[in-house]
């Protein structure tokens, strides 16, 4: 079964806050749900499908009850930061098969305000965490290996932050709005060699939500039509053989699956929302998705190709996780939201991509250097 053209994004909402000390996580989920419903012109009584991940307090049953929903389909797939891209694909499958007709997907949390639970579980706790396999260290290891294999430099990685900051200056809700230079990035404190502080994403409270529905319903609503035409997902772990190669991610599998279903190529894409937990995350995904050859990512970004109005592939025009928002340490939701804004023509005029009719939203979840998931969505303006 193909989901091509079967599901439309009728509502989007990104919470404007980046710091919410006086709100509960459940309240944030309710606020983003309300915002997406208002964007679509619907009410909660219209929802018959609900999707959430590990950030939802009490899980899917508790959230359905708290939000006052009556659903006939639900999904709580948990794959870290790319969960919401996975949910979009799964919602499209549910809609295509008649399991539901209007799905709500929510993300919310407070990592900036409240304590985060320990990340390591299972095999990680027993065999990896004790040896210093923290998030920053693992991504630093990936960056170092990429440099060793392909000659990538810290200055090239810095161009990704520069592009993100160029876009963030136009986003009134971005956490960091100051435009930075390559020198600024290289002069920021070292966090995990070779990654500097400015190579790392922000930590923010907040969240976001999506409304996904059928073509018939979407055409009856108020927003410009945007549909999902391709989706792919994959998991990569460290067990055996080539899986130990730190220079590629599960995007090498999820990307081609999404492009094949959509019937398009990387060269057709007008705008890219690329997961940016760290600058190295972006570089690896650009290569793995086919926007440049493996090993050429450094030159691709240093040529300014990610800057809207200048480059070949404008990316993360809201400022992304590097500058604007990385709610709950999970950036997949905001990647979809900004892609939809671009396709609707609702991005900030200074960063709006002209005639944007085809976009990609891609994310990862987990740790690139150990085990992680990837999910790729190809979106089209109708």
Segments the model singles out, each with a brief description of its role:
Residues 1-79, 93-97, 104-201, 208, ...:
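Conserved "HGTGT" condensation-loop signature of ketosynthase/thiolase-family condensing enzymes
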Residues 86:
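Active-site histidine-anchored catalytic micro-motif
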Residues 211:
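Active-site ligand-binding patch in enzyme domains
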Residues 329:
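Internal catalytic or translocation cores that form aromatic/hydrophobic pockets or channels
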